[in-house]
Regions:
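Hot-dog-fold acyl-thioester-processing enzymes
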Residues: 1-70, 131-152
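Short helix-to-loop capping/linker segments positioned immediately adjacent to catalytic or ligand/cofactor-binding
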Residues: 36-39, 75, 95
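HotDog/MaoC-like acyl-thioester-processing domains
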Residues: 1, 77-152
Length: 152
């Protein structure tokens, strides 16, 4: 059994590949009251959330007991359903918190040719590390540049 990696600022998560199955996206969108036809053959960027959590879990980061603080996706190009996607990421910052630490990470989602289609920054309270007082939880920027509604 291998030793858990030392997690610190700059740590790079091992890359993983996955694809979003059309049936999964249709089921989840329908369950949420969203017409899957809005996305056609494109992947809804929200479908990238679970694979991101899998990257964290593969490095021994507990998901249970964590508190999601923020997540922002920047989509440059749409992925197609069933297309192979490679995710890579790194830790930007680890800050103390009474419940463990505030973990801020950046991720890139790329096509097989290396084209980065989506970038994400997420933060959350993770129940790891010394439980120390914090200087407050930093709020993400509320800048809305680049946001647009998908036509319905």
């Amino acid at each position: 059994m291998s030793e858990a990696p030392v997690l610190e600022d700059g740590f790079e998560f091992p890359g993983q590949s996955f694809s979003v199955a059309k049936a999964d996206q249709v089921r989840k969108l329908t369950c949420s009251g969203i017409d899957p036809a809005i996305y056609g053959e494109a992947v809804d960027v929200a479908m990238l959330g679970l694979p991101t959590l899998r990257v964290l879990m593969a490095c021994g980061l507990p998901i249970l007991g964590g508190v999601h603080l923020s997540q922002r996706f920047r989509q440059k190009h749409a992925f197609l359903l069933e297309e192979e996607i490679t995710i890579s990421g790194r830790i930007l910052e680890i800050a103390p918190h009474p419940r463990g630490c505030i973990l801020k990470c950046a991720f890139e989602y790329a096509r097989q040719d290396g084209t980065v289609c989506v970038e994400a920054v997420r933060s959350g309270i993770s129940p790891i590390g010394p439980k120390e007082p914090s200087n407050g939880i930093p709020r993400p920027s509320e800048e809305l540049d680049g946001f647009g509604e998908i036509s319905r």
